[in-house]
From Swiss-Prot:
CDD domains: NAD_bind_m-THF_DH_Cyclohyd (cd01080)
NCBIfam families per the UniProt record, alphabetical: PRK10792.1, PRK14186.1
Stated name of the protein: Bifunctional protein FolD
PROSITE patterns given in the database record: THF_DHG_CYH_2
GO cellular component terms listed in the entry, alphabetical order: cytosol
Catalysed reactions, as listed in the record: (6R)-5,10-methylene-5,6,7,8-tetrahydrofolate + NADP(+) = (6R)-5,10-methenyltetrahydrofolate + NADPH; (6R)-5,10-methenyltetrahydrofolate + H2O = (6R)-10-formyltetrahydrofolate + H(+)
Record has Hydrolase as a keyword: yes
Subunit organization: Homodimer.
Record EC number: 1.5.1.5, 3.5.4.9
GO terms (BP aspect): L-histidine biosynthetic process; methionine biosynthetic process; purine nucleotide biosynthetic process; tetrahydrofolate interconversion
Family: Belongs to the tetrahydrofolate dehydrogenase/cyclohydrolase family.
Keywords assigned by UniProt, alphabetized: Amino-acid biosynthesis, Histidine biosynthesis, Hydrolase, Methionine biosynthesis, Multifunctional enzyme, NADP, One-carbon metabolism, Oxidoreductase, Purine biosynthesis
Pfam family of the protein (one): THF_DHG_CYH_C
C-alpha cells in the first residue's frame, strides 16, 4: 500500500477561491469587505514570515488587511490598549495577535482581551468552550483546517479511533474536541503518556503535533490509517520534515499529509474562513 497524499495546498486554494467569491458578492451588494487586523509585537523572524503570509492571503481574497507592528519594547498596556481600540472598530471583523509574544507579556491576558466575536484565531476560552459544548462558532485554525482536509477527501470519521499526539492549546486539545464532535473515539497522548507506541498502533486517524523531526517511526502506523502530520521542522541539511517518519509511514497509511504542503496552508485558509464568518454573522451592518 502507498498512501495518497492529502494536498493541503490545493484544498487551501479552493477554500480561498470560495471566500473570494463571497467577498466579491458582498461588495457588489454594496456591503464593505471583511477587515482583519494583524498585530505583531517585536521582530521575531519566523513570526514576520507567518504574518506576511497571512496579510498577503487576506489581500488576495479581497479583505481589508490592517497591519499593526509594535516594537519588542512595547508595554503590555500598549498592546491591550490597541486590542481594545480594534475591538471597538466597526470596520474590523477579526483581530489576530501573532504568537509568541515577547517575554514578560501575559499571553492569556492578551488573548482574553480580544472580543470573542473577533477572535478569528479561535483561542479565546469562550470559543474553545463553545467547541467543547458542541456549538462551535470561531474554531481554532489548525484543527479546523485539518477537519476541512479530511472532509474534502471524504475520509469517514464517525466511529473511528483517533489518536492525537500533543496536547497544546493551539493544536492538540482543540483537535481532540474537533474529532470528538466528528464522532471519533479519541485518545490524547502527551509527555506523561505510557506506551505511546501501543496507542499509535491502534489509531485509525493519527494527528501528530509535537514539533520533533521524525518523532513517530513509520513502522508504528496501523495499516490503512490516516496520518495527519502537523509538525514542520528544519533539519541541519535545510530539509523540512514533519513529526512522522514520512517515507515509511506512507507505505502503511491510506492517506497522509506531506510536509510541507499538507496542514500548513490550511491554517491560513481557516483564518480567512473565520474572518469571513465573523463578518457575515456578527458584524453584518454596513
Amino acid at each position: 500500500m502507498t498512501a495518497q497524499n492529502i494536498d493541503g495546498t490545493l484544498i487551501s486554494q479552493t477554500v480561498r477561491s470560495e471566500v473570494a467569491a463571497r467577498v466579491k458578492a458582498r461588495v457588489q451588494a454594496g456591503l464593505r469587505a471583511p477587515g482583519l487586523a494583524v498585530v505583531l509585537v517585536g521582530e521575531d523572524p519566523a513570526s514576520q514570515v507567518y504574518v506576511g503570509s497571512k496579510r498577503r492571503a487576506c489581500e488576495e481574497v479581497g479583505f481589508v488587511s490592517k497591519s499593526f507592528d509594535l516594537p519588542a519594547t512595547a508595554s503590555e498596556e500598549a498592546l491591550l490598549s490597541l486590542v481594545e481600540e480594534l475591538n471597538n472598530d466597526p470596520q474590523i471583523d477579526g483581530i489576530l495577535v501573532q504568537l509568541p509574544l515577547p517575554a514578560g507579556m501575559d499571553t492569556t491576558k492578551v488573548l482574553e482581551s480580544i472580543h470573542p466575536e473577533k477572535d478569528v484565531d479561535g483561542f479565546h476560552p469562550y470559543n474553545v468552550g463553545r467547541l467543547a459544548q458542541r456549538i462551535p462558532k470561531l474554531r481554532s485554525c489548525t484543527p479546523k483546517g485539518i477537519i476541512t482536509l479530511l472532509e474534502r477527501y471524504n475520509i469517514p470519521l464517525r466511529g473511528k479511533h483517533a489518536v492525537i499526539v500533543g496536547a497544546s492549546n493551539i493544536v492538540g486539545r482543540p483537535m481532540t474536541l474537533e474529532l470528538l464532535l466528528a464522532g471519533c473515539t479519541t485518545t490524547t497522548c502527551h509527555r506523561f503518556t505510557q506506551d505511546l507506541e501501543g496507542h499509535i498502533r491502534q489509531a485509525d486517524i493519527l494527528v501528530v503535533a509535537v514539533g520533533k523531526p521524525n518523532f513517530i517511526p513509520g513502522a508504528w502506523i496501523k495499516e490503512g490509517a490516516v496520518v495527519v502530520d502537523v509538525g514542520i521542522n528544519r533539519l541541519d541539511t535545510g530539509k523540512l520534515v514533519g513529526d512522522v517518519e514520512y517515507d515509511v509511514a506512507r507505505t502503511r497509511a491510506s492517506f497522509i499529509t506531506p510536509v510541507p504542503g499538507g496542514v500548513g496552508p490550511m491554517t491560513v485558509a481557516s483564518l480567512i474562513e473565520n474572518t469571513m464568518m465573523a463578518c457575515e454573522q456578527f458584524h453584518t451592518q454596513g
